[in-house]
Amino acid sequence: MLNCNSYMGDKNNKKLGLKESISLVVGNMIGAGIFMLPASLAKFGSISIFGWVISGFGAILIALIFKRLSQKFPGKSGPFHYTKEGFGEFLGFFVVWGYWISILLTNAGLAIAITSYSGVLFPILQNNVQSIMFSIFVIIVIAIINNYGIKTAGKFQLVTSILKILPLLLTIVIAFFVFNTDHFIMLNTSGESNFNALTATAALTFFAFMGIESATIPAEGTHNPSKTIPKATMIGSILTICIYLFSSIALMGIISPIELANSTAPFADATGIVLGNIG
């Protein structure tokens, strides 16, 4: 995730364009949530798909708010400035610190997710000590890259966004070959009412939409922010919602509910199932 320090002191020719701004939204939204949530949602059954739809609709509404605010206050950097403009510096102070703490916690979760998936390729990372050290290493490396400036950080964000999207798109593609509709027979397997299951899955999946405001944060380092940021916010949000929904459906069609609930790396397991079937 890009660090706000990397937005300081960059020249105009080093400002972010539309594709980098979109990658900010997509890359920061597609984090630990989508890679780890399918296992948590498996116990609810196929009703979790509707949870994604509900939270996705809520995310679109929030994206529209940020779009409007970025047009009303062009060049102003995200939630802090928006709050300050409307309610004063005192509340703006609390918002910026609350936002910083939330991002700090999110980065920790993302590092854990990266380590969990890396453990599939490197079993040594399944050891507690090695996994902790690797997670810390990931955070340090990203922090160092951020300090090289906004353009470098933007390019890095674009590359990492593509790398995060690829396994999700791969899951959607391979689902065409091994999709099992029997996995969707039971709508609600949680033992709770449909309403309670929907509210629970909507709350869980909404975590995956953190980062929807990302294009607004480096407004001062964005080229033509009044046009670039609104476009990036909406395009990035809609693209991410579609990827979330279709990759989740694909994953549920590949892995049985019981196996999915016990998985520590669902998308890696889905690839393993396909390769096993081919073999």
List the predicted regions and their residue ranges:
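Select transmembrane alpha-helical segments in multipass membrane proteins
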Residues: 15-25, 88-101, 134-138, 192-205, ...
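Hydrophobic/aromatic residues within transmembrane alpha-helices of membrane transport systems
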Residues: 17, 31, 69, 88, ...
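Membrane-interface "cap" regions at the ends of multi-pass membrane proteins
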Residues: 1-39, 44-47, 59-67, 75-76, ...
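Residue-level recognition of membrane-helix boundary sites in multi-pass small-molecule transporters
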Residues: 20, 47-50, 91, 152, ...
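Helix-loop-helix junctions that connect adjacent transmembrane segments
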Residues: 7-12, 48-49, 125-131, 158-279
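Transmembrane helix-loop junctions in multi-pass membrane proteins
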Residues: 33-38, 145-151, 180-181, 278-279
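Hydrophobic transmembrane alpha-helices that form the core helical bundles
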Residues: 39-43, 60-139, 143-147, 152
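Lipid-exposed faces of alpha-helical membrane segments in multi-pass integral membrane proteins
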Residues: 26, 30, 50, 54-61, ...
